[in-house]
Swiss-Prot record:
Keyword flag Iron: yes
CC per GO annotation: chloroplast thylakoid lumen
GO biological process terms, semicolon-separated: photosynthesis
Subunit structure comment from the entry: Monomer.
Name of protein: Cytochrome c6
Taxonomic classification: Eukaryota, Rhodophyta, Bangiophyceae, Bangiales, Bangiaceae
PTM note: Binds 1 heme c group covalently per subunit.
SUPFAM superfamilies: Cytochrome c
UniProt main location, coarse: plastid
Length: 110
């Protein structure tokens, strides 16, 4: 009985991990589309056309405590300084997907 439960649990875990990775990849694809349509005008290539020292590069995100999904989604939703708020214009899922895309690109070096 224990062995059967162990095998079932292991199989279930692999299924969950597999589905999560597929969903995450799809989220990055959507995030890229959302970013291209809404963010790239100011942040093309991870740069910042308005405030050149506030790029989306990994080291700058870390230095400004913006290297997490919550921090990025909060700023995108609410805006800050010259950055407009996108809450109300974009659904939460699109904002989160764009945040995941930004973090993914920052890890790759844009």
């Amino acid at each position: 009985m224990k062995k059967t439960l162990s095998v079932l649990f292991t199989a279930f875990s692999f299924c969950v991990i597999g589905f999560t990775q597929v969903a995450f990849a799809a989220d990055l694809d959507n995030g890229e589309k959302v970013f291209s349509a809404n963010c790239a005008a100011c942040h093309a290539g991870g740069n910042n056309a308005i405030m050149p020292d506030k790029t989306l590069k990994k080291d700058v995100l870390e230095a400004n405590s913006m290297n997490g999904i919550d921090a990025i989604t909060y700023q995108v939703t609410n805006g800050k300084n010259a950055m407009p708020a996108f809450g109300g214009r974009l659904v939460d899922e699109d904002i989160e997907d764009a945040a995941n895309y930004v973090l993914s690109q920052s890890e790759k070096g844009w």
